[in-house]
Amino acid sequence: MENTTPLRKQYLDIKKNYPEAIVFFRLGDFYETFEEDARIAARELEIVLTSREMGKGLKVPLAGIPYHALDNYLSRLINKGYKVAICEQVTKPGETKGLVQRQVTRLVTPGTVVEPNLLQTKQNNFLLSLYLTEDSCGLAFADISTSEFGCTQTNISELEAEISRLSPAEIILPKNQSLNLPIHLKATISKLDGYYFEADIARERLLRHFECQNLSAYGCENMPLAISAAGALLNYLEETQKSSLKQLERLSVYTTADYMQMDSHTLSNLEIFRSSGGNSLKGSLLGILDQTKTAMGGRLLRKFLGQPLLKQSDIEKRLSAVDYFFEESLARTSLAKSLGQIADMERMANRIRQKTILPRELISLKNSLETVSAIHRQFGLMPPPRLAYFLNGLKPLPEMLDIINKTITDDPPSTLGDGKVIRAGFDPEMDKLCSLAGDARTFLSQMETRERERTGIKSLKLGYNRVFGYYIEISNANLGDVPPEFIRKQTLVNAERFITPELKEYENLILNAKERLLEMETGLYEQVLNQLGGFYSALLANATALAALDVLSAFAEVAVRNSYVRPVFHPENRLDIRKGRHPMVEQGLGYGSFVANDISLSAEDCQIIILTGPNMAGKSTYLKQTALIVLMAQIGSYVPAETAELCLTDRIFTRIGAREDLSAGQSTFMVEMVETASILNTATSRSLLILDEIGRGTSTYDGLAIAQAVVEYIHSQPSLTAKTLFATHYHELVELASYLPRVKNYNIAVSEDRGEVVFLHKIVPGGVDKSYGIHVAKLAGLPKWVIKRAYEVLTELENPAKKQPKSRTCQSQLQLPMTGQTSVLEEEIKELEIESLTPLAALNKLYELKKKAEEQGL
């Protein structure tokens, strides 16, 4: 360290406190990174990696960015999961002896972003804090850009569902704990010292934040794990934000039992937030329903989808509001137009509180407040009864509008310092400074013209840079005409730069005026923000009301476009849907192309539907549309059906598709069984179970046995008796209806004509005893030889009396053993699930069977 420069020592002292972050070190007009940080920045930001001498014989890697381009580069690093410590100059050059003082003013992490261009407009940016025990967990979350702060304590089995619902950008954990994230989630994991999660430390942090003596008023006094998570979260935010976190005024405490529960598999299988194919908004339920016009409405819709209601009165309030907008098309259209002019008032309110809002954003806020007044005139003066509940917070804020109108210019720049933010006439002293700076600039322009005429040098020009200040530049060709009073300041390749006493005098005048102007404008702007901060709660209340109106009117718009109907709720444990449709599949097919289907499920007489039929015929679509209709109804939306009479559903479970969990070392079948076990252990009589192909991951007889046992268990357990849709390729299960009274058989109608099969996609009563797997294989494009041979093998398998000691030889001389002595191959063929094989897998299987037959000399 002896040969290290003072600047490097200062940097190292700061860097040692932020070893896991990239330090952006302010040096004049640049943020510089050093050493390994510089290598990372150069690679990830695609900027030049250079070096700087920072001691005798010591060259340090260096990469920098202009200070005004910070947000752009910051977003690229944050999106890749990095943390960035912003180290600013906190004193001015010359104010203190030696180096300019520097300190980290903020640690930016994926879960603590507040810059608008770094955030998804219609999605919260949650920071999640977890404290885990063997069977329980405390969970706390916050979005400092919207002031949301909440916590809960729940069973460890429900944790993954909450993580999937919140989709946090960052998760904090004690250093001695670990977490396996859902496969679709890309969250940064940050570890904290376990000290911050200790019960007494965390409780004290919450009490200090809310300035209270106990937490009873917040409803979490008896949630010790939730308190640990919430207290640690506040400590982390305080460390990263270097502020008091005043925007987190309320703590929302909830339990998972307050809402319909859906695990992460259900959210994924039903494609609630993202499509399974492209992992995008398009093709998801959110993509269908999101006709919202505001950022606040988009975020609220996500919350609705993640937390369907269980209280019928709350559902009916939403449905009544949707009724109004459904019936009043002019009001709906007018509101949509107005909402389209509303900025993100929720995040703006918090940026005012944090004093980070830009002058130009205040004009956007002013325009939004004017639109709020117009919406209030339309709905608030005489509130329609069906909207009254959601209009409570909608109130014009004329005083706030007046402050902005009187203080901020009509078209301010994004930054302060040029005297163009504060309106003329607001502060006399500032007006004088602006005039002085303006006069000086005019003088310089006039001086340039005058000196050109006086010297006869037409190419003479005045310029400015931060190193030399103002200067007169003269090309080499005209140096012979330079007056003697010009003082040489800098030599360039093709020109010389000069100053004069007169120019230096005005330089001091201008720079002093600019410095004083920046100080004064910054101070006045802060005063304005302090005044506007007094309307924080009222602004948030307006944002909340507008978000609700936005979502509910969007539900009505979707209902009108797609011919949805209002669902009806009743106390009986049954659901009865007439001509139900799958909202996403219907959109993909186009209007009128989807085949609608009925469904009736009841705990009294039709608790379980066994659904049989070929793949590709629509079994999964039918199962999913039922669950989606139930979910849509309980968020207060109309539903895709002709009629829908429903009961409240406490949980939706889905067991669909095959997947491995490689991180846990679990096979496809083990994953299937674990998920099925979870469903059977936690479902209630008010749950809806969607089970597709239980038992497919093992041998035929094992799978059939498990599938049958699952159906019998759901039917016979008094504490379960959940409404169940059970799709299967095991045709033997249709026999269950003969001795289980609440089991009914349904199948997918198929039309056959001269060997051609047409799937009608219509659900009809009764079971089927025939598979159409080979037909599906034909549709998939398997070679004609394979299809022909498959039909031959199927015929032999279905007619054992006609078997010969050896099967006849086909054109390719492929022989399949069918005698008693070759029972192993025979059993393997019987267990083939042809309808589940891809074309390539089917062909590979045929070659495998051929090889085994040849090895046996058959």
Swiss-Prot record:
CDD domains membership: ABC_MutS1
Binding residues for ATP: 613-620
Pfam families: MutS_I, MutS_II, MutS_III, MutS_IV, MutS_V
UniProt cross-references to Gene3D superfamilies, sorted A to Z: 1.10.1420.10, DNA repair protein MutS, domain I (3.40.1170.10), MutS, connector domain (3.30.420.110), P-loop containing nucleotide triphosphate hydrolases (3.40.50.300)
UniProt entry keywords in alphabetical sequence: ATP-binding, DNA damage, DNA repair, DNA-binding, Nucleotide-binding
GO biological process: mismatch repair
Record's keyword annotation contains Protease: no
GO molecular function, a single term: damaged DNA binding
InterPro entries found in the cross-reference section: DNA_mismatch_repair_MutS (IPR005748), DNA_mismatch_repair_MutS-lik_N (IPR007695), DNA_mismatch_repair_MutS/MSH (IPR017261), DNA_mismatch_repair_MutS_C (IPR000432), DNA_mismatch_repair_MutS_clamp (IPR007861), DNA_mismatch_repair_MutS_core (IPR007696), DNA_mismatch_repair_MutS_N (IPR016151), DNA_mismatch_repair_MutS_sf (IPR036187)
Protein biosynthesis keyword on record: no
Highest taxon, organism lineage: Bacteria
One GO CC term, this protein: cytosol
Record function comment: This protein is involved in the repair of mismatches in DNA. It is possible that it carries out the mismatch recognition step. This protein has a weak ATPase activity.
PANTHER family tied to this protein: DNA MISMATCH REPAIR PROTEIN MSH1, MITOCHONDRIAL (PTHR11361:SF34), DNA MISMATCH REPAIR PROTEIN MUTS FAMILY MEMBER (PTHR11361)
Family: Belongs to the DNA mismatch repair MutS family.
Protein known as: DNA mismatch repair protein MutS
Name of encoding gene: mutS
